[in-house]
Amino acid sequence: MVKKVALECSECGRRNYSVPARPNHEERLELKKFCKHCGKVTVHRETR
């Protein structure tokens, strides 16, 4: 089974997306995604 990590909105702190974990990467994933709670596109960071 694939481990999943959550992507947390940098503005409101809600965890809106889950993506497969990247075991060979030390740095955390950052993507610009739409946050339905903020109503705009914000940076979402990987949480562990």
Swiss-Prot record:
GO MF annotation: an example: structural constituent of ribosome
Provenance organism: Limosilactobacillus fermentum (strain NBRC 3956 / LMG 18251)
Family: Belongs to the bacterial ribosomal protein bL33 family.
Domain of life: Bacteria
Any one of the GO CC terms: ribonucleoprotein complex
Designated gene of the protein: rpmG1
GO BP: translation
Pfam families: Ribosomal_L33 (PF00471)
Keyword annotations of the record: Ribonucleoprotein, Ribosomal protein
The protein's name: Large ribosomal subunit protein bL33A
